[in-house]
From Swiss-Prot:
Its cofactor is FAD. This is Ferredoxin--NADP reductase. Homodimer. It comes from the Bacteria. It catalyses: 2 reduced [2Fe-2S]-[ferredoxin] + NADP(+) + H(+) = 2 oxidized [2Fe-2S]-[ferredoxin] + NADPH. Pfam families: Pyr_redox_2 (PF07992). Its EC number is 1.18.1.2. It comes from Rickettsia massiliae (strain Mtu5). One of its GO terms (molecular function) is flavin adenine dinucleotide binding. Binds 1 FAD per subunit. FAD binds at D33, Q41, Y46, A86, F120, D286, T327. Keywords: FAD, Flavoprotein, NADP, Oxidoreductase. Belongs to the ferredoxin--NADP reductase type 2 family.
Length: 334
């Protein structure tokens, strides 16, 4: 049995920043994550993807962001319980007891749920025999962009992942086809602007009004992707690689059975301190839902700070928190 102040579920960027914030407030942390390494989707799905909206970083790779967040949290000696899920929750007086899938027991006064999309997997397009090409010609996640150098690539989707990867890979690919069933893209406006600028060259071709229809190839080697419009007109795109980006399937797993208010696979919280309907349990980052929610990493950072400042009196038995700036606090911790 471990005893701690705060149990953080999720070791993605928001969970890691929560470790730092808790440490600055004098709180000890244990962190639970289902993956074998810390970093969440940033490491598992897109370590090389550039992130542009982190303050003070004009551009930073997801993997590097996680490295910096881990370094920032390290002085506070968090204990990580990786490759295991939080499966059971029991309330005991002023404490919560969590049991993991490896039978680890952790007792804490506050729980911060920063589980991102929960357990995640790709939404796969309904194409015949697509599994024959997976991991060789069809990829749902990118962890090594160099394998796509000089390739003809079909990217399918209209959101941030599809648009961002089309831009990012355009420097190394021979040709990119971006297939989307609509004329408008739902990615960030600046990303769409960059996309359309590059599309004026031969590096990216926008194939709008079409959807994926079939794959053609042999021995897991893709030769072409067949797309179809609303009038059943087809077009063959010569391609070696297919990257379908249709979002993730979300699964809260055991968290859905903890008595929390859940809506559309997200945990509902108040918009002031991000506390759930159970006092002492907070949800932050992509897993949290409230009016006006923005699914951004930097928003999750702010939610981590607010929730832990609010949790201070619970952790320290009603003691009032006297606010100090980090320059003062960090000097005391050294």
């Amino acid at each position: 049995m471990y005893n701690t102040d705060v149990v953080i579920i999720g070791a993605g960027p928001v969970g890691l920043f929560a470790v730092f914030q808790a440490g600055m407030l004098g709180m000890k942390c244990h962190v639970i994550d289902a993956q074998e390494v810390i970093g969440g989707q940033c490491i598992t799905l897109y370590p090389e993807k550039p992130i542009y909206d982190i303050p003070a970083y004009p551009k930073i790779a997801a993997e590097e962001l996680i490295k910096q967040l881990e370094l920032q949290a390290a002085p506070f000696n968090p204990i990580y319980h990786l490759n295991q899920q939080a499966i059971e929750l029991n309330k005991q007086d002023d404490f919560f007891e969590i049991k993991t899938s490896k039978n680890t027991l952790i007792k804490g006064k506050v729980i911060i749920i920063a589980a991102g999309a929960g357990s995640f997997g790709p939404n796969k397009p309904p194409l015949a025999n697509i599994e024959d090409f997976e991991s060789k010609s069809v990829f749902y996640f990118i962890n090594d962009k160099s394998k796509f150098a000089g390739k003809n690539i079909v990217i399918a989707g209209g959101g941030d992942s599809a648009v961002d990867w089309a831009i990012f890979l355009s420097d190394i690919a021979n040709k990119i086809y971006l297939v989307h069933r609509r004329d408008k893209f739902t990615a960030a406006p600046e990303s769409v602007r960059q996309l359309r600028h590059i599309a004026e060259t031969d590096k990216i071709e926008l194939v709008t009004g079409y959807q994926l229809n079939a794959l053609d190839g042999n021995n897991a080697e893709l030769q072409s992707v067949i797309v179809k419009d609303l009038h059943n007109n087809t077009r063959k795109l010569d391609a070696n690689i297919l990257l379908p980006f249709f979002g993730l399937k979300q699964d809260l797993g055991s968290l859905a059975n903890w008595g929390l208010n859940v809506k559309h696979h997200h945990i509902e919280v108040d918009s002031s301190y991000y506390q759930t309907n159970i006092e002492g349990i907070y949800a932050i980052g992509d897993i949290a839902h409230y009016g006006g929610k923005l699914k951004l990493i930097l928003t999750g950072f702010a939610e981590a700070a607010s929730s832990l400042h609010h949790a201070y009196s619970r952790v320290f038995d009603g003691k009032a928190l006297h606010f100090e700036y980090s320059t003062t606090k960090y000097g005391e911790k050294k």
